[in-house]
């Protein structure tokens, strides 16, 4: 049948909503006949959608009892990853990137009549970027690296500072970088980000944090001068600068270890020994105390002036440690004197109860010998740079003679435990130990003869025990070996196992004269060690090879401070940490000999590399460190909770972007200098894992890597 409309023949009757006349089959319909409606589909919804968001579309089906539709994108049922996808409910999700043509057609096709459909175009736009934080860290002079973290950044995004575009490097969807010039004295820097067209629009504005110190400098300093950096302490050093942070630490009061009471409390009696409490006190102090530099220097001193609870009563260890911590920022002579008078050292190396010898005999030489050989001078004469002095035949020159050892031993006689009130006992030796006060002298037991010491110095006869002690210590303190011998070891413990002779010489010069004519000023020495060009070389050179193997206790404290922890022991004890470090051949004040856990002169077999901490490293310890790392990241440490769950700080970063989480691990544990290939491998290893497992695996891979085990 044909349709006749206003005199025109249109063909088969398909017109809708009009009055029609139908001729044929012997019947006719007049102008007042009922209108016939044809099926139709109309699509309505947003005309634009941004990447990362969704748009909802509605299909209105007319003149069909079945109103169900199937959705298409660019004629593809359900869409695909190139043009975007759409659900049965009409929710359209654009692709991850803008397609070649950024407008697509969303179509609804009638289920009842597939030839009936409706479409609507939708333009795909770039997202609006969102800034979470912006940080500017110095490179040199007024040049800064600006790091902008946030979300929805796309390749081609543009950073603006103060309304002006700056050359921008796209790192990831959550990070952008730029090099900017910030004039001296600038306190505020407004930053926003504009993604490129289509749909370019400015983000929120934030004020960038302008730091005095870059992340690598701050993190490396904290690695050298504390028991491990955390994000908070890194930001603190960035804000204050290296020199000001050191000054702040010098003025931070010490955090003393609590004295262990007598009789022992039950918590100390688990192994019938006070070491449980003594070691717990040490772990808690070094992990949580604000006086991190003081405690780190005290730790270094404890590995030079060695005593051990293997032979000493552990009650005296807390007093001894507090002595080192209190004296850490004083003068090296003060350290020598207070160590010599401490009951812990007295008992350990037999100066305690060493009385004057009968005619023809000599008093105990133990302390006299070790004080010179291990603590202050060394066996052979040194140049100011720590290298050996040689005689005309090319042989080392001994620092002292056996006869001089005996003379010093005589100078150290007459000392015993103080009474409970700190006074001199009525009898010698005092059989009642006082572990918490300096030793006192019983003059009748002191050798009052004259003594000939180093460099021909003579202590006159008739002096008191204290006068002889001070005279003997001054004689050693003034010896030119002390500076290079002690300073090299401090450098080894804090910065690098292999300091250059020039580095040692620079610090020795400060030891000899702090600039004001004072010898042995520990604050000047410590500042010089940490601020030396060799100490800071790795701040700007990620390939710098100086540093040292992290000894077990430092490896553990660095991890715990880096990720955070909660002590869950009913008594607040930290002692369980000793059980783990002991498996790696180290625990607080438990060296097996006066030579420390490792001697400063240790050389890796088969090499000429001086690397003291490697004396603790072997196949078994390497495997045990891997096992301990697994326990740490999986929260299996007795008495502690270590949260690396999906809701932890690292977990939240991983949920937003695994890249950001790995970068944060790099900031905390690798000075913000994680090698690119390592970062890529870690991200590949965690791809596809759940959020919590991403955090744990990434953390494990970082802390067990050789790049982390050796602190550069």
Q: Locations of the language-model features?
A:
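Flexible, low-complexity segments enriched for small/polar residues
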Residues: 219-226, 265-267, 479, 483, ...
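Active-site substrate-binding loop specific to GH73 endo-beta-N-acetylglucosaminidase modules
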Residues: 238, 278-283, 316-563, 709
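Immunoglobulin-like IPT/TIG beta-sandwich domains and homologous Ig-like subdomains
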Residues: 67-75, 89-91, 95-99, 111, ...
């Amino acid at each position: 049948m044909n349709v006749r409309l206003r005199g025109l023949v249109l063909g088969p009757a398909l017109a809708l909503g009009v009055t029609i006349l139908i001729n044929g089959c012997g019947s006719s319909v007049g102008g007042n006949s009922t209108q016939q409606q044809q099926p139709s589909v109309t699509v309505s919804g947003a005309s634009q959608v941004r990447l990362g968001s969704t748009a909802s579309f509605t299909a209105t089906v007319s003149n069909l009892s079945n109103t169900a539709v199937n959705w298409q994108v660019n004629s593809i049922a359900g869409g695909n990853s190139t043009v975007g996808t759409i659900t049965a409910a009409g929710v359209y999700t654009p692709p991850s990137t803008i397609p070649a043509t950024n407008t697509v057609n969303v179509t609804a096709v009638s289920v009842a009549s597939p030839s009936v459909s409706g479409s609507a175009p939708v333009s795909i736009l770039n997202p609006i970027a969102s800034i979470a934080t912006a940080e500017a860290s110095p490179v040199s002079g007024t040049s800064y690296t600006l790091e902008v973290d946030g979300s929805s950044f796309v390749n081609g995004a543009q950073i603006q500072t103060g309304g002006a575009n700056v050359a921008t490097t796209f790192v990831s969807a959550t990070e952008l970088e730029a090099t900017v010039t910030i004039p001296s004295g600038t306190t505020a820097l407004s930053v926003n980000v504009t993604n490129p067209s289509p749909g370019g629009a400015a983000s929120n504005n934030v004020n960038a944090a302008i730091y005095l110190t870059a992340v690598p400098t701050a993190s490396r300093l904290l690695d050298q001068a504390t028991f491990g950096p955390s994000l908070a302490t890194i930001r603190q050093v960035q804000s204050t600068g290296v020199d000001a942070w050191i000054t702040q630490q010098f003025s931070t009061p010490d955090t003393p270890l609590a004295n262990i009471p007598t009789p022992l409390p039950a918590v100390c009696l688990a192994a019938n020994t006070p070491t449980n409490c003594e070691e717990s006190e040490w772990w808690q102090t070094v992990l949580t105390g604000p006086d991190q530099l003081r405690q780190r220097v005290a730790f270094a001193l404890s590995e030079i002036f060695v005593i051990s609870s293997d032979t000493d009563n552990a009650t005296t260890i807390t007093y001894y440690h507090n002595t080192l911590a209190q004296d850490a920022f004083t003068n090296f002579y003060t350290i020598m004197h207070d160590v010599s008078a401490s009951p812990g050292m007295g008992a350990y190396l037999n100066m305690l109860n060493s009385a004057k010898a009968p005619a023809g005999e000599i008093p105990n030489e133990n302390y006299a010998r070790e004080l010179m050989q291990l603590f202050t001078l060394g066996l052979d004469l040194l140049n100011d740079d720590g290298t050996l002095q040689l005689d005309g035949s090319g042989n080392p020159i001994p620092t002292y003679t056996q006869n001089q050892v005996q003379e010093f031993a005589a100078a150290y006689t007459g000392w015993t435990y103080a009474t409970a009130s700190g006074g001199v006992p009525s009898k010698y030796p005092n059989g009642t130990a006082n572990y918490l006060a300096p030793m006192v002298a019983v003059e009748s037991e002191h050798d009052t003869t004259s003594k000939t010491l180093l460099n021909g110095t003579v202590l006159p006869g008739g002096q008191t025990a204290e006068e002889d002690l001070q005279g003997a210590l001054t004689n050693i303190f003034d010896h030119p070996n002390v500076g290079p011998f002690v300073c090299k070891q401090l450098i080894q413990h804090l910065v690098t196992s292999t300091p250059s002779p020039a580095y040692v010489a620079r610090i020795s010069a400060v030891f000899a004269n702090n600039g004001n004519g004072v010898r042995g000023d520990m604050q000047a020495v410590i500042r010089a060690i940490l601020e030396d060009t060799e100490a800071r070389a790795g701040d700007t050179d990620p390939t710098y090879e100086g540093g040292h193997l992290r000894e077990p206790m430092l490896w553990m404290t660095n991890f715990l401070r880096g990720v955070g922890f909660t002590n869950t022991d009913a008594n607040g004890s930290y002692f369980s940490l000793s059980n783990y470090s002991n498996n790696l051949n180290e625990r607080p004040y438990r060296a097996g000999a006066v030579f420390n856990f490792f001697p400063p002169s240790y050389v890796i077999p088969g090499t000429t590399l001086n690397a003291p901490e490697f004396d603790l490293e072997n196949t078994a310890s390497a495997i045990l460190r891997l096992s301990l790392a697994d326990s740490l990241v999986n929260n299996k440490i007795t008495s502690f909770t270590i949260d690396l769950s999906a809701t932890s700080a690292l977990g939240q970063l991983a949920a937003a972007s695994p890249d950001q989480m790995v970068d944060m691990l790099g900031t905390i544990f690798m000075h913000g200098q994680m090698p690119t290939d390592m970062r890529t491998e870690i991200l590949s290893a965690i791809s596809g894992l759940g959020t919590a497992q991403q955090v744990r695996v990434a953390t494990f891979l970082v802390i067990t890597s050789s790049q982390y085990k050796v602190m550069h």
